[in-house]
Each structure stands twice: as structure tokens, then as C-alpha cells.
Curated annotation (Swiss-Prot):
Name by which UniProt lists this protein: Small ribosomal subunit protein uS12
InterPro entries recorded: NA-bd_OB-fold, Ribosomal_uS12, Ribosomal_uS12_bac
SUPFAM superfamilies the UniProt entry points to: Nucleic acid-binding proteins (SSF50249)
Subunit structure: Part of the 30S ribosomal subunit. Contacts proteins S8 and S17. May interact with IF1 in the 30S initiation complex.
Protein task: With S4 and S5 plays an important role in translational accuracy.
GO biological process, one term: translation
Native source species: Rickettsia bellii (strain OSU 85-389)
Cross-referenced NCBIfam families: rpsL_bact (TIGR00981)
Membrane-crossing residue ranges in chain numbering: none
Keyword list, A-Z: Methylation, Ribonucleoprotein, Ribosomal protein, RNA-binding, rRNA-binding, tRNA-binding
Family indicated by similarity: Belongs to the universal ribosomal protein uS12 family.
One Pfam family, short name: Ribosom_S12_S23
Length: 129
């Protein structure tokens, strides 16, 4: 505990918070261009082929981005919208592609959790009674 005189001479230092998605530069989303689409294997206890893209963001930074959902339409040179969000079992992947934005289609046939996968709402047909 500092004395009163110590606080007069040196003010308290505030804690520096470290961001988990530095390439976004405090923005919720950034747009970018897809350079490479590839599959990556996860860390030890898990086994799969996770879909990952390398994207050059509008601020000239290059990042690895996870493509969520089943089947995707991401190709090289596609424009993508990137949000923060780590993938726990993929080292170095700290960002997600936003499906249903720009050149990327949403997941087809999705009924639950549609907003996360860019799936449109099913149209209900009115019936006469």
C-alpha cells in the first residue's frame, strides 16, 4: 500500500488490456480478400480437417481465418468479412469468416442458429381455412 506522498509523486498505473484480435484494430469487423483456402488438422486430442483461409485485410495485414459450418463457397480472390473469435484447437487462428456477407453464401438448409451461419429464414406459406 503506497503512502500519501508516494501517490502524490507517482500516480497509479492503469492495467494495460491486451486484445485477443489485434489485426482488427479495435473494429468489430474488417473486410479482406481471400488469398488461400486450405484444410488444417487440430491439436492433439481432436481429429478433423478444419477449413481455414488466409485473408489479406483492408489494413494490409494477413491473417488465418476459420470458415464455420458445413460446406462453404469461399474461393481464392473472394471478398470476405472477418470477425474476431478464436478456434480453441487450431493454433494461430484467431478470426472467423462471417457467412452470408459479400461473396460468401450462408449455410443451406440451416434451421437453428441461422444468424451465425448466414442462413435465410424459411418462408411460411399462409393457408386459407
Amino acid at each position: 500500500m503506497p503512502t500519501y506522498n508516494q501517490l502524490v509523486r507517482f500516480k497509479r498505473k492503469s492495467k494495460v488490456r491486451k486484445t485477443k484480435s489485434p489485426a482488427l484494430e479495435a473494429n468489430p469487423f474488417k473486410s479482406g480478400v481471400c488469398l488461400v483456402v486450405k484444410t488444417v488438422t487440430p491439436k492433439k486430442p481432436n481429429s478433423a480437417l478444419r477449413k481455414v483461409a488466409t485473408v489479406r485485410l483492408s489494413n494490409k495485414r494477413t491473417v488465418n481465418v476459420y470458415i464455420p459450418g458445413e460446406k462453404h463457397s469461399v474461393k481464392e480472390h473472394d471478398r470476405v468479412l472477418v470477425r474476431g473469435g478464436q478456434v480453441p484447437d487450431l493454433p494461430g487462428v484467431k478470426y472467423h469468416v462471417v457467412l452470408g456477407a459479400y461473396d460468401i453464401a450462408g449455410v443451406k438448409g440451416r434451421k437453428q442458429g441461422r444468424s451465425r451461419y448466414g442462413a435465410p429464414r424459411k418462408q411460411v406459406v399462409a393457408t386459407k381455412k
